[in-house]
Amino acid sequence: MLTKLLCEFGATALMIVFGVGVHCDTVLKGTKYQGSGHMFAITTWSFGISVCLFVFGGAVCMNPAMVLAQCVVGLVPWGNCIPFMLADMLGGFVGAVIAWFMYADEFKASEGVVDPIAQRNIFSTNPTTEGTNYARNFFCEAICTFVFISAILAAASRAGENVLMLAICVGLIVWAVGMGMGGITGFAMNQARDLGPRMAYQVLPIKNKADNNWKYGLLVPGIAPFVGAIVAALFVHGFLGMF
C-alpha cells in the first residue's frame, strides 16, 4: 500500500512539474519559450503524462476522478479510494511548488510585466469568460472527463500488460481531448491537476496575485470530473462490457 501511495504521489508531482512548468515557459518573462502558445503546452502535457506512466507504471491514476472510476469498475479497491486521492492531491501541490521554485527568477522578472491573471492561470484552469455560465462550463468539463476516462479505460483493457503501449495511448488521448475540447475550460479533468496547484498558488510568495477564483475551481474542476468519471466507468463497464 505504501509503495502504491508513493507512486501516486510521485507520478502526480512529476506530471505537474511538466504541466505547470510548460505554462511557466509560455507565460513568464525571460524563458526561452515565452509565447509558444497552447499547442506547445498541450503537447508537453501529453508527452509528460506518458513519461510519468513510463516511470511509475500503468497502474497509477494521478487523478482523483480516475481513482473513482477505477473503484467503480473494480480495478482499485474502495478502501484505497481516499488514500489514493489524497496522495494525488498532495502530489499536485508539491509538483506545483517544485515548478515555481525552478522558475522563481522568471516569476520575479515578470512582476508588473506579465498580467497577474495570466500568472494565476499557470497553476489552474479557468474558463474563457470568467465567472459566467457555470452550467455550461460544468457540462464541458464533465464531457471532457467522460471522453478522457472512457478512452483510457478502453485503451487499458485492450493494451493488457503492455504498459508502454498504454502510456503512449494516454498521451494521445490527452492531446486529442485537449486540442478538440479544451478551449472552453482548459480541460482540467483532474482535481489534482487543478486544485493541487491552485492551493500552491494561494500560499506561494508570488507578488500581485490575482483572485484565485475558488468558486469556479471548487465547482467546475472540483466536482465535474467526478461526474464525468462515474458516467465513463458505467459506460465502459455496462455498455462496452470491459472489466
Predicted segments with their positions:
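Membrane-interface helix-loop junctions and terminal tails of multi-pass membrane proteins
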Residues: 1-243
